[in-house]
Amino acid sequence: MKASGFTPWPQEMAQKYRDAGFWTQQTIPEMLEASAQRYSECVALAAGEQQWTYQTLVEQVDKLAAGFQHKLNLKSGDKAVLHLPNVGEFYLSFFALLKIGVQPVLALPAHRYSEIRYFCHFTEAKVLITAPQLGVKTAEIAQQVAADLPSLKTLVWAGEESLMPTGAQALNTLFLEEVGAQSDVAEDFAFFQLSGGTTGTPKLIPRTHSDYLYSVSASNDVCQFSARTRYLCILPAAHNFPLSSPGALGCFMAGGMVVLAPDASPQTAFSLIEKHQITVAALVPPLALLWLDEAARTQQNIASLQVLQVGGARFSEEAAKRVKPELGCTLQQVFGMAEGLVNYTRLDDPESEIVTTQGRPMSPADEFLVLDEAGNPVPKGTAGILFVRGPYTIQGYYHAPEHNQRSFTELGYYRTGDIVVMTEAGNLQVVGRDKDQINRGGEKIAAEEVENHLLAHDSVHDAAVIAIPDEYLGERSCAALVCRAKNPKAIEIKRFLRGRGLADFKIPDRVIFVDVLPKTPVGKINKNKLLELI
């Protein structure tokens, strides 16, 4: 079933990817079923005290797919928002929805009312699947969204029934013996991921079975995942990095074992590494720094760890050099985006490349350009904006013609917004962004979105949100406010933003008050000048 609002690859390009074997006819649930045939009694997934073998996982997915279909009356083409922490129910729901052709929106645990309501409204989702999160009123968020949106027919609760929102249905009551129908074909639009974006409107990224499975397969080839791989999922399971680079799907494809971490603390992670003999883990730079600090004092044995992937933001050379001597494993830098392109340092790259670059594209079919502002190619060693197209890089955002016009060229190249330098060896060094976006430890914050919320405050006349350098997170956010009369307290501003349902990571780390915001000659806020003043 071809979805409206989805931009397909041009036929000539799509045929090239089929002929090369990059795109196959396998769907994501069929990939899991194929692994279950080969590794039926092997443990596929561990979460807390629960474990699923490949056979059990497939059986549970089938039963849940039947429940979604027959109890909730979901059908192919419907949308569902998944707002789940790192629990086994995330993968059960993800595979089950795909199996019957329902297209999940993979919301992140950090998203709150504002974002969840938007995802449900924009996609006309029929169901919201959520669960308890420590310190988050997920039940209240779900009830409020459901009250706002008549199109949202069902709330599904994947947690203790005593905490369940009124009117919700418990996920554990949905498992049926009936067989759910298969989704359509591999090149159909399968699910949504989310772009950090630079505007106040989150952009939805449509992925197909074919392009996503190729991304996973190519990642496995580079990262050498196998049935012996034991992957620790610390980052949010819904995020592209731990889902497909190679992530959990790569582990399932190879017949390995995925272990879910209930929180991101290094103490929890090190305990799980020792317990399950973890071989691979993926982190963002701030977590990697915490691991390096914890390694000096831990009593846990983490000698099984062979590879530590670090991505999501620039990892400093100084920190990168510490990984091998202090953690005893190989560092693999990862630079990618939910829109597609993934770069890896190779496991056998020289140490000098591993610690100073963010890798190179993983596929021979990745076509990339490094251009100046005028659109001219720049030589190696010179910074430019990265453009890319290929068999797993999307051709457009979902129902977003204005964004697509700005973000994609006529030839189908995606303008990443990343400023990079290509080394003589062909690796990329990420040196910045050309978009008004803050990268707070791997979490992308659109300055415009936060500014729009700030301008809704009665006291705020003008607002600018900028990135300020931070040794730990890479960047932190700072809001500079011009107020109408008496300046409110910074804590009041933060409380106001939380009250509007903004995710915690988007709340400015610092709030300052100024008499006037510096402007460019054409009247726009001069954020470079503002940063100098701060």
Predicted features and spans:
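Conserved structural elements of the adenylate-forming
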Residues: V58-A66, I205-S226, I234, A288-L292
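Conserved AMP-binding/adenylation subdomain of ANL enzymes
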Residues: G101, L213-R230, N240-V280, E294
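Gly/Ser/Thr-rich phosphate-binding loop
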Residues: I278-A282, E294-E353, E367
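Conserved AMP-binding/adenylate-forming core of the ANL superfamily
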Residues: F22-Q25, P29, E33, E41-K75, ...
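Conserved ATP/PPi-binding loop(s) of AMP-dependent carboxylate-activating enzymes
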Residues: P361-A365, N376-S407, I445
